[in-house]
From Swiss-Prot:
SUPFAM superfamilies: ArfGap/RecO-like zinc finger (SSF57863), Nucleic acid-binding proteins (SSF50249). HAMAP family: RecO (MF_00201). The gene is recO. GO terms for biological process: DNA recombination; double-strand break repair. Involved in DNA repair and RecF pathway recombination. Gene3D superfamilies: Nucleic acid-binding proteins (2.40.50.140), Recombination protein O, C-terminal domain (1.20.1440.120). This is DNA repair protein RecO. Keywords: DNA damage, DNA recombination, DNA repair. It comes from the Bacteria. One of its GO terms (cellular component) is bacterial nucleoid. InterPro entries: ARFGAP/RecO, DNA_rep/recomb_RecO_N, NA-bd_OB-fold, RecO, RecO_C. The keyword Transmembrane helix does not apply. Pfam families: RecO_C, RecO_N. Belongs to the RecO family.
Length: 249
C-alpha cells in the first residue's frame, strides 16, 4: 500500500549508519513513526527534508506483516527560517512540542492539532518577541482540545456572564464560577481568576497563536492564569513540568 501524506516532522533519530526513524504529525493519521531507509545519505529522495519542524510532502509505503510505515521520498514544503537561530523562541517551540507529545489527541482532533502546531511554529518563526505566556496559552488550547478546559464565558452555577469581577476555577470539577457562587460549590482546590486572567483563558480558546504572541498582561494576571492552567493540567491530564519535560504527576 502506498499513499501521499503531508506531515510535520516532530523528531528524527538515527538507528543505523544511514537509516532513520521519523516521528510525524499528519492531519489525517495523527502522530505516527515511519522509517527512512538510507534517508541520512540520500540527497535525491529526501533533499533538505529530514529535520525536525519541517513541513514535508511524503510518499509513504506500508510493508511487512506488522504494517510498518516506510518513507519512499519527500518534498520539502516549508521550514522555519529564523526559529532555529533564536534560542528563546526555539525554547518556546520545544516546550509546546513536548506538551503535545505528552498528551496525544484523539482521532477526531487530528486536523485541529495539526493546524495548531503549524500555526504555533509559523508564529514563533515570525514574532520578534513573543509573549512569555505563549507556551502556557498553547497548553491551555491543547487542554481544550482534550475537552478538559472549562467554559469561561458564563458562571457554571448560575449562568451569569463572567467579566471584570473575575471568577473562581474549581479544579476538580473542571468549571468556572462567579465569586457569588463560590460558596455554593463543593470543596477542593480553587484558583482565583481576575478579569484579565479570565480574558487570557478566553484567548486560549477563542484566538490563535498570532494573537497569543502579542499578549502582555499584568504580571499578577499572568500568574493567576498560569496557576489555573497548571492545576487543571495536573489534575485532569496527570501532567506536570519538571526538569525540562512533562512527567506523569
Amino acid at each position: 500500500m502506498e499513499y501521499s501524506d503531508q506531515a510535520l516532522i516532530l523528531a528524527v533519530k538515527r538507528f543505523r549508519e544511514i537509516d532513520a526513524w521519523v516521528r510525524l504529525l499528519s492531519p489525517t493519521r495523527g502522530v505516527y513513526t515511519a522509517f527512512a531507509f538510507g534517508g541520512l545519505k540520500s540527497r535525491r529522495r529526501f533533499l533538505g527534508c529530514l529535520d525536525p519542524l519541517n513541513h514535508v510532502q511524503f510518499k509513504v509505503r506500508r510493508s511487512g506483516y506488522r504494517g510498518y510505515h516506510c518513507l519512499a521520498e519527500g518534498k520539502l514544503l516549508d521550514a522555519p527560517r529564523q526559529l532555529r537561530s533564536h534560542p528563546q523562541r526555539l525554547g518556546m517551540a520545544v516546550n509546546c512540542l513536548k506538551f503535545f507529545e505528552a498528551a496525544p489527541v484523539a482521532p477526531g482532533s487530528f486536523a485541529q492539532a495539526y493546524g495548531l502546531m503549524r500555526a504555533m511554529l509559523s508564529t514563533l518563526d515570525a514574532a520578534d518577541e513573543p509573549s512569555p505566556l505563549f507556551p502556557l496559552l498553547f497548553r491551555a488550547r491543547m487542554t481544550f482540545l482534550h475537552g478538559m478546559l472549562p467554559a469561561c464565558g458564563q458562571c457554571a452555577v448560575c449562568g451569569q456572564p463572567l467579566g471584570h469581577d473575575g471568577a473562581v476555577c474549581h479544579v476538580e470539577e473542571g468549571r468556572v464560577a462567579c465569586p457569588d457562587c463560590r460558596a455554593a460549590a463543593s470543596g477542593g482546590v480553587h484558583a482565583r481568576l481576575g478579569g484579565e486572567a479570565l480574558a487570557l483563558l478566553a484567548s486560549a480558546v477563542e484566538q490563535g497563536p498570532e494573537q497569543w504572541a502579542a499578549c502582555r498582561p499584568h504580571p499578577a494576571a499572568g500568574r493567576e492564569f498560569s496557576r489555573a492552567v497548571d492545576l487543571l493540567v495536573r489534575y485532569h491530564m496527570g501532567l506536570a513540568w519538571e526538569q525540562g519535560g512533562f512527567v506523569r504527576a
